[in-house]
């Protein structure tokens, strides 16, 4: 549930100072679509995203929180996991007579769940940003050095990540299609479950989360806008599945969602 409005807002900063917060509520259907291996998946996730532009660039962060209830079959209720990303971009070049700009990007990722902390990482590198004249079509591409930090029994190592972020608003602002796609190199569930050790546990991980929204209240405004829609989490080597029940590495986890852009 992340980065999905960053692309549009990052382009706006080229015009004027700008800030926005949105809150999302997702009902996760992954447990139903993957009963063989995700029977313990959380049913509810909330996301808070904040973007603020200034003269030098922009700051962005999001926080995901996962929840379980009595009906989920878990003895633990309430918040059972949290994850956040915070990033800073500095604009250093703009292509004359075009809507293309370049930024220097720095980012931190970290979080935890009931089994312990996730492996933290730091990312740095360049980013390319593009938008059309009315900002209804946007695209960002990042090519980043990613350093996985040592901790919790996992070795630190150098890696990379490529990220694409897009946004398209159409049908007289009624519909928005947005999302991101990440590809990186790190420890994978499949290699760990096979009993591999050290660097042999690592492999390519792919994650994309396209979202489709119907903007039902204040659709022509960036603020006080209410949207209803869905997110599809599509991944390979990302989900830590129940190895006793499944051997596959590709997963589809859809949600039903509400979003309030403040």
Task: Place the predicted regions along the sequence by residue.
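Transmembrane beta-strands of outer-membrane beta-barrel pores
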Residues: 27-31, 65-69, 106-112, 143-149, ...
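Membrane-embedded beta-strands of outer-membrane beta-barrel proteins
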Residues: 48, 86, 124-126, 162-166, ...
